[in-house]
């Protein structure tokens, strides 16, 4: 029997506000344990939450970017549960009326086709703290993350393969990043994914029993975990077994999923309206203000790169996959850089350097200005493409002007025949055996002189000019 895969994803995204959702404490990642906390985060008696307007701004932008309807009458709810990283014993979230609902996003699949994936809801909530278990037998609680603003985006169960889930996450990350509401860095926990997957016989409308997958710390692991679950569940069903409703985690080392807990039924969180936060309304004016702040999104930007700048579909897709890279490209082209040349450098030498150094574009000293200047001095013959690679590494590590560095470092390409011809004659004088081979008609003997000349000029001879002059002087040599 063949089965159809049914997948839905729940994505938690940390919003990039300066302070937390209900307290003035910093929401910055990476500080010492419990440095970003105050009495609200610790849930001292008598303290009251105050809603951060910037969180609602981000929620509105997310809803608009994901083609969602908005609940204009806003309220929050208490989700009750006890856990050490949750000192209040409840989480402030949204239950029956999330800020956004009934949305969709279009994704591009590997075969070039597109598919519209529904988004059931997006609700605002506070993050919990973090438990760590020490080797000394004690467990520790870090509340830096407690109260960091989240938006949870819940898809419809519209995905029918791990490939579609991967494509959905890629598109969602792009939209969220371009909207400017999160840096969506999975390695820092600012984007976290839970997956729900079930199988059903083809033609059956009723969903099968679902399994929830956790510990999916990269898009690649989401895909691998889902692929394993498809295989595991299919084997159980084909052997006459039944799927249990359970939560499993992905084991990256063994590329399997491991049982965490069996779900006997839906958890009863005893939701009720949050009494410490008043109801409020999102006005049409507020919504339109947020709409005007939304940028051009990846799909539109890709189309413009192809139609206006003459880039290929592949190049346009690669450049727009990351907003930082795309914005860098935009500025470089606006400064007069050739779109194809800038694209080639960003996808070639720049990408290789970033991978080797383990850094992002923001973490190096390369700027649109010095990249455009470097491309210009390649075009005008000041440096060769080979020398440019060395210049780029210097700019990436140290910044500064490309032309200034080239001149100070003595890297300017030699193009003047008055300088090159005497060097060519000296090469002939220094390599009598090669000259004899050439004069005797030995095959490919002339090619040796190219290497001799480049060595004599330390690679600074303009290849086009040097080869033309070398051919000219070799012809004279043969006549004599």
Swiss-Prot record:
EC number: 6.3.5.-
Keyword Hydrolase: no
UniProt entry keywords in alphabetical sequence: ATP-binding, Ligase, Nucleotide-binding, Protein biosynthesis
Pfam families the UniProt entry points to: GatB_N, GatB_Yqey
Coiled-coil regions listed: none
Database matches in SMART domains: GatB_Yqey (SM00845)
Highest taxon above the source species: Bacteria
InterPro entries: Asn/Gln-tRNA_amidoTrfase_suB/E (IPR017959), Asn/Gln-tRNA_Trfase_suB/E_cat (IPR006075), Asn/Gln_amidotransferase (IPR018027), Asn/Gln_tRNA_amidoTrase-B-like (IPR003789), GatB (IPR004413), GatB_C_1 (IPR042114), GatB_Yqey_C_2 (IPR023168), Gln-tRNA_amidoTrfase_suB_CS (IPR017958)
The keyword ATP-binding belongs to this UniProt entry's keyword annotation: yes
Catalytic activity: L-glutamyl-tRNA(Gln) + L-glutamine + ATP + H2O = L-glutaminyl-tRNA(Gln) + L-glutamate + ADP + phosphate + H(+); L-aspartyl-tRNA(Asn) + L-glutamine + ATP + H2O = L-asparaginyl-tRNA(Asn) + L-glutamate + ADP + phosphate + 2 H(+)
GO annotation, biological process: glutaminyl-tRNAGln biosynthesis via transamidation; translation
NCBIfam families registered for this protein in UniProt: gatB, PRK05477.1-1, PRK05477.1-2, PRK05477.1-4
Family: Belongs to the GatB/GatE family. GatB subfamily.
UniProt subunit comment: Heterotrimer of A, B and C subunits.
Biological role: Allows the formation of correctly charged Asn-tRNA(Asn) or Gln-tRNA(Gln) through the transamidation of misacylated Asp-tRNA(Asn) or Glu-tRNA(Gln) in organisms which lack either or both of asparaginyl-tRNA or glutaminyl-tRNA synthetases. The reaction takes place in the presence of glutamine and ATP through an activated phospho-Asp-tRNA(Asn) or phospho-Glu-tRNA(Gln).
Protein name, per record: Aspartyl/glutamyl-tRNA(Asn/Gln) amidotransferase subunit B
